Amino acid sequence: SNGNITTLPVSGTSVLTCKSGKAVLSCKLTVVSPDNIITNMSTLPTSSNQDRFTVTVNSYPNVRHYTVYRQSASINASSFKNYMPYHGCAACAAATVLTGFGKNITPKRVTDKNGLEYKAFGKKIWKKNYKKELKDQMPVSLYGINKILNNNGIQTEYVRRFSDAEACQQIISHLKTGNPVVIEAKKGKWANSYHTMVLLGLTDTGKAIIADSANRTGFGSKQRVKYESVSNLIKHMFACSVSGAKSANCYFGSSSGGGYILVNPNL
């Protein structure tokens, strides 16, 4: 009736049966390695053409529930007219990460007055961006997202300069801990210019689970959640320039907007 259960350091499932007299208790146990966490494709959405919905991804010691947003949806709009459809990918990405850590955050709460940007950057920096005309406003930079996450109690490691091989290995290893990675894509398959997305985890088929706030008909029916190998994603990412690697710009600039953020790293 008293004692400890010891498991081997490997993943898998087993059945534990306990008997006491005529009573029998049978439990199915799942052993999870905290450095090899994956999510079965069968549990992930096959259709994600919604304005706002939740994706559940395995983590350690529990699962994480992420809310994924469509940046062009009126339900997710900012107080700044048309900002979210044009520039809202970063705000959506920040909100998605925060929801996975138990915080009830929407993109609007990221951008609006007295919101997360305002509190993390200060009134002067926030106002300078949003008083501009729409075409001159900028999305939050990865540096800015990093600052928002830290300001809300989430540890991060912002990697600004990288080689493709090193980044691929580091991102895969990090995703296997059950924690997300925020990335910036350049113009091409994933973006019309620059675009911020969140890698939520890895599937049992080895693909990254991607939360993408933008509509992409090339992926079929404008899905919010997409799946791609990390090695292919790396081809569309970019590092900060040497001069931009020390930038403290909270809003996007192409020289300082690159890299990726490891969220909740094992520091």
Regions found by a protein language model. Give the residues of each.
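Extracytoplasmic soluble-region selector
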Residues: S1-N36
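Active-site-adjacent structural segments surrounding the nucleophilic cysteine of cysteine proteases
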Residues: V32-Q137, K187, K222-E228, K235
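Solvent-exposed, acidic/flexible segments
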Residues: N82-A91, K135-L142, D164, C168, ...
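Residue-level detector of short, conserved catalytic/binding motifs and their immediate flanks
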Residues: S14, H87, H195-M197
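Short beta-strand segments
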Residues: A23-C27, I154, H195-M197
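Noncatalytic regulatory segments and standalone regulatory/sensor domains
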Residues: L202-L267
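Active-site-adjacent substructure of cysteine-protease-like catalytic cores
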Residues: R160-F219
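Mid-length scaffold segments of soluble, non-membrane domains
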Residues: N129-Y158
